[in-house]
C-alpha cells in the first residue's frame, strides 16, 4: 500500500508535489490503490509512477504528465485529462468513462486494451500508437493524429476519420466498410488487404499509399490525391474517382468495372490488365499511361485523352471513344470491334494489326 506521507504530498497540490518529487527518489514513490478523486492536480508530474488501481474520478488532471506511468485498472471516470501527456504509458483495463481526453498525448502508447469509442479525444495525438485489432467502429476520430500508428486488423467500420492524419499508418487487413476519411491524410499509409467498400475517401491526400488487394467497391474517392498510389489487384467495382489525381499510380489487374473516372488524371499510370469495362471516363487523362491488355469494353470514353499511351492488345469492344484523343497512342493488336470512333483525334497513332471490325466513325 502507498505510504500515507507520500499521499499527503500529492494532496497538497500539484505545485507542492512537483517540487517535492524533484528531490525524491522515484523508487520510493508508490501510489497504488490510492483514492485521489475530486482533486485539483492541474499540471502535476506523475511520469514513470505506478498508478495501478488509483481512483482519479472527477479529478482535474489538465496538462498532467503521466508519460511512462503504469496505469493498470486505474479509474479516470469523469476526470479532466485535457492536454495530458500519456505517451508510452502502460495502459491496461483503464476506465476512462466520461473522461475528457481532448488534446491528450498518446504517442507510442499500447492502446489495444482501451475502449476508445465514445471518448472525447478532441485533437489528440495518437501517432505511433499500437491499435492492432482494436474496435473503433462507429467512433468519431476527426482531425486526430494517427500518423505512424499500427491499426492493422482493426475494426473501423462506420467510423469518422475526417481530416485525420493517418500518414505512414499501418491499416493492413483493417475492416473499413463505410468509413469516412474525407479530407484525411494517408500519405504512404499501408492499406493492403483492407475492406473499404462504400468508404468515403474523397479529397483525401493518399500520395504513395498502398491499396493493393483492397476492396473498394462503391467507394468514393472523388478529388482524392492518389499520385503514385498502388492499387494492384484492388476490387473497385462501381467506385467514384471523378477528378481524382492518379498520375504515376499502379492499377495493374485492378477491377474498375462500372467505376466513374470522369476528369480523373491517370497520366503515366500503370494499368496492365486492369478491368474498366462499362466504366465512365469522360475527359479522363490517360496520357503516357501503360495500358497493355486493359479491358475497356463498353466503356464511355468520350473526349478521353490517350495521347502517347501504350494500348497494345487493349480491348475496346463496344466502347464509345467519340472525340477521344489518340495522338501518338500505340494500338498494336488492340480490339476495337463495334467501338464508336466518331471524331477521334489521331496523329502518329499506331494501328498495327488492330481489329476495327464493326467500328464506326473512323477508318485508318
What kind of region is each of these model predictions?
Residues 1-2:
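Terminal targeting and flexible regions in eukaryotic proteins, enriched
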